[in-house]
């Protein structure tokens, strides 16, 4: 929803309701990432109209302080960055358990400069791994091509240990790379600019859904 038209937010919410699978909510604090997005009033407004699950991507420091508050907004998925846990010396496994305690799917996100092997210890705990294919903080960035290898590495380990963990990809996702991302092992594709700036957003979503 970072690329939505916030002056006409309800229109874009209805568009997502009609053609997509989830609402991806990018929460930025200007500390962990160099940008500020939106907070609880916007999320609560979206929640009033959303009929599809809401996925909160927390690009913030001390995310654990806000897990309960986000849970109360009605989100069904919530991820935090491994970098945030590292920064505070927190155990990502414990943080994943905290999210799950609210009955929410728990995800662990990593930026492009974090080795994919760093998430391997948590693949039996996380419901999904969010692989950033751009550096978190801004929409409309160019897709980083090494993302495919990162996805394949994580998918291979998921298969090796028999985990049900899924892979979500966010950043520069579009119809031009959706098929290759799915082939690499991604199950959840987050597209912002490619959808909201398209002449026909619903058709764009349908093209990407067809690759699954």
Residue spans for each PLM region:
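Short glycine-rich anion-binding loops that position phosphate/pyrophosphate groups of nucleotides
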Residues: 134-136
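Glycine-rich beta-strand-to-loop/alpha-helix junction loops that act as flexible
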Residues: 167-173, 190-194
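Conserved N-terminal beta1-alpha1 strand-loop-helix module at the mouth
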Residues: 1-79, 83-93, 98, 106, ...
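Short acidic loop-to-helix transition motifs that present clustered carboxylates
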Residues: 113-115, 174
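Acidic, divalent-metal-coordinating active-site segment for phosphoryl/phosphodiester hydrolysis
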Residues: 172-184
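Residue microenvironments linked to proteolytic maturation
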Residues: 102
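Internal catalytic-core helix/loop-beta-alpha segment
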Residues: 105-109, 113
């Amino acid at each position: 929803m970072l690329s939505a038209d916030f002056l006409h937010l309800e229109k874009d919410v209805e568009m997502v309701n009609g053609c997509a699978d989830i609402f991806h909510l990018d929460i930025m604090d200007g500390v962990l990432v160099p940008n500020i997005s939106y907070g609880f009033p916007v999320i609560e407004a979206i929640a009033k109209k959303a009929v599809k699950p809401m996925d909160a991507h927390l690009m913030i420091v001390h995310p654990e302080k806000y897990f309960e508050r986000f849970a109360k907004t009605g989100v069904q998925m919530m991820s935090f960055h491994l970098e945030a846990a590292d920064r505070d010396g927190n155990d990502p496994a414990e943080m994943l358990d905290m999210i799950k305690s609210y009955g929410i799917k728990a995800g662990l996100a990593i930026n492009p400069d974090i080795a994919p092997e760093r998430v391997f210890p948590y693949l039996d705990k996380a419901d999904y791994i969010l692989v950033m294919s751009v550096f978190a903080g801004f929409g409309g960035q160019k897709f980083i091509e090494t993302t495919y290898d990162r996805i394949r590495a994580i998918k291979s380990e998921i298969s090796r240990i028999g985990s049900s963990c899924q892979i979500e990809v966010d950043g520069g996702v579009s119809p031009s790379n959706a098929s290759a991302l799915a082939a690499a092992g991604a199950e959840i594709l987050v597209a912002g600019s490619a959808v909201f700036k398209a002449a026909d957003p619903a058709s764009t979503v349908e093209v990407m859904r067809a690759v699954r």
